[in-house]
């Protein structure tokens, strides 16, 4: 299946000069969504990625991370932006182009030495994925891989990630 054909391009969003890759058209296609999850599962198995937990980065990482966790027999844990989780959290601040942001996970969500796979819909500059990796490693988890639906290769985000398997299904 040609997944790229299911992604809609929206020029000048969210600002002029940006070409936004919109996955809502992929998500609404039942066969495309099923194929995406099955293909990501297959790629993880081929790379021998066997996580205890799949970490989904807010918010579109939740969409793909939950069914992937189910397929891999793993638990699912959301990584949220600051202030979205009700219990005590581990957190990490990271730099954005114009400022900083913060990611959080419940303190009781991950056990030391847990094997984790980080999933998101897209990798661009790698900032959010890199911060997520640092957060789970700070907790004492073993990072076993990354899974992305889309990778924007020109932005070279993967060079900022740890040396573990990195799966991307669609490349631009």
UniProtKB/Swiss-Prot annotation:
EC top class, as a word: transferase
Transmembrane segments: none
Subcellular location(s) per record: Cytoplasm
PROSITE patterns assigned to the protein according to its UniProt record, in alphabetical order: PUR_PYR_PR_TRANSFER (PS00103)
GO biological process, one term: AMP salvage
Cysteine disulfide links: none
Keywords, alphabetical: Cytoplasm, Glycosyltransferase, Purine salvage, Transferase
Top-level taxonomic group: Bacteria
Main subcellular location: cytoplasm
Pathway(s) per entry: Purine metabolism; AMP biosynthesis via salvage pathway; AMP from adenine: step 1/1
MF terms in GO: adenine binding; adenine phosphoribosyltransferase activity; AMP binding
Cellular component GO terms held in the UniProt record: cytoplasm
InterPro entries: Ade_phspho_trans, PRibTrfase_dom, PRTase-like, UPRTase/APRTase
Role of this protein: Catalyzes a salvage reaction resulting in the formation of AMP, that is energically less costly than de novo synthesis.
Family, per entry: Belongs to the purine/pyrimidine phosphoribosyltransferase family.
Subunit structure: Homodimer.
Protein known as: Adenine phosphoribosyltransferase
Organism: Nostoc punctiforme (strain ATCC 29133 / PCC 73102)
